[in-house]
From Swiss-Prot:
Phenotype reported upon loss of the gene: Deletion of the gene results in a growth defect on D-xylose and L-arabinose.
Subcellular location: Cell membrane
Induction, as annotated: Up-regulated in the presence of D-xylose, L-arabinose and D-arabinose.
TM regions (residue ranges): 14-34, 41-61, 70-90, 96-116, 126-146, 161-181, 211-231, 242-262, 266-286, 287-307
Protein name from the UniProt record: Xylose/arabinose import permease protein XylH
Subunit architecture: The complex is composed of two ATP-binding proteins (XylG), two transmembrane proteins (XylH) and a solute-binding protein (XylF).
The keyword Repeat is assigned to this record: no
Gene that this sequence comes from: xylH
CC annotations in GO: plasma membrane
Membrane-related topology note: Multi-pass membrane protein
KW Cell membrane (keyword) present: yes
UniProt xrefs under CDD domains: TM_PBP1_transp_AraH_like (cd06579)
Function: Part of the ABC transporter complex XylFGH involved in the uptake of xylose and arabinose. Responsible for the translocation of the substrate across the membrane.
Length: 356
């Protein structure tokens, strides 16, 4: 890849926008680049960034999940309960590992439920996960009585290394893992195919429902991890730690980063850079004394602009494919399109197998 191709990439352009924003806030207030403020930016970026890349994966296959805040509130309560039940029987460190793994297993079951309702019962994922959001937020409130719980045993997950918060390091690890999953495994191939053309992908052997369920499970685990990591940082957990704002900002970051809401197109790096964009604005506005309401208005405006541009880009793409669409109405046209799609998927399979 030459320099010109790099410059043309949307991710590079978004990176430059983030640099310009950071420099603007620095010239407005030099405290913006202080070590304490950088740590603050990274702390918020860690949470929204993990959610953004998870949502980007799910949006790539044409679905969306609004339930992570509920899982971030509910699952850590279960983690703490398991830890308190077993730490005396085994030493504290193994108890931490076991409690996290078991609670992530619970999160996986919730993700499986979201996936099955969406794919098998044919309920729109937006409706499914709004229901899950209210369901598990309610359970968390009942379970905790509405009171916060102390969460001191997991503090190492939320500490700092120099000016870098440990949660930010976790977010980078999640980004690398999902990039490898998307670009170098069959699950990644299936994810893109399912979002691009679910009917055609199914005809050439892609297990569309299965890959969507897998991505719902991944998203549920991400929501749970965000709750555990944030609880480790502030040393308390509860049913009101997270609101729907965090997932909406994560989705906004994914959209700003170039991920299409209708599936098949997107970038995990772009989603993470979108998280940087939102984190910089939120922190910079706070330093400049701009209130949160104005931030919400500006963020909403940015999302509307991106969505309008995305709509016209999609419309232009449909026009370019009009000939193929017209020919697909005949049996010969359908066979030809199916063969082309099958060839492309098999080509990607070969690339994945070579990397394995």
């Amino acid at each position: 890849m030459n320099i010109l191709n790099v410059v043309r990439r949307f991710e590079f352009q978004l990176f430059l926008v983030n640099v310009i924003i950071a420099l603007f806030f620095y010239f407005e207030n030099s405290a913006y680049f202080s070590s304490n403020n950088i740590t603050t930016i990274f702390q918020y970026l860690a949470e929204i960034g993990i959610i953004a890349i998870g949502e980007a994966m799910l949006m790539l296959c044409g679905e969306i999940d609004l339930s992570p805040p509920a899982l971030a509130n509910f699952v850590p309560l279960i983690t703490l309960t398991i830890y308190n039940s077993i730490y005396q029987a085994i030493s504290p460190t193994p108890a931490i590992v076991v409690s996290i793994l078991l609670s992530l297993g619970l999160a996986s079951l919730i993700g499986l439920m979201n996936g099955l309702i969406t794919t098998k019962a044919k309920v729109n994922s937006l409706i499914t996960t709004v229901g899950t959001l209210f369901l598990f937020n309610g359970i968390a409130l009942i379970y905790s009585g509405g009171y916060p719980e102390s969460f001191p045993y997991f503090r190492f997950l939320g500490g700092t290394v120099s000016i870098l918060p440990v949660p930010f390091i976790w977010s980078l690890g999640a980004l690398v893992f999902l990039i490898l999953l998307l670009h170098y495994t069959k699950i990644g191939v299936w994810t893109i195919a399912a979002g691009s053309n679910p009917t055609g992908a199914s005809e050439v052997g892609v297990p569309v429902d299965r890959v969507k369920i897998i991505n719902f499970i991944i998203m549920a685990n991400i929501g749970a991890l965000v709750g555990i990591i944030q609880g480790s940082r502030v040393l308390t957990i509860g049913a009101t730690n997270f609101t729907a704002d965090v997932v909406l900002e994560g989705i906004a970051a994914a959209v700003i980063g170039g991920t299409s809401l209708v599936g098949g197109k997107g970038s995990l790096v772009g989603a993470f850079l979108g998280s940087v964009f939102i984190s910089e604005l939120l922190n910079g506005f706070n330093i400049l004394g701009i209130n949160a309401y104005e931030f919400d208005a500006i963020l909403g405006g940015a999302i509307v602009v991106v969505m309008v541009l995305s709509y016209y880009a999609k419309r232009a793409s449909y026009k370019l494919k009009s000939i193929a669409t017209a020919t697909s109405s005949s049996p010969e046209g359908k066979d030809r399109i199916t063969k082309i799609l099958k060839f492309k998927i098999q080509k990607i399979y070969r690339r994945v197998e070579e990397n394995e």
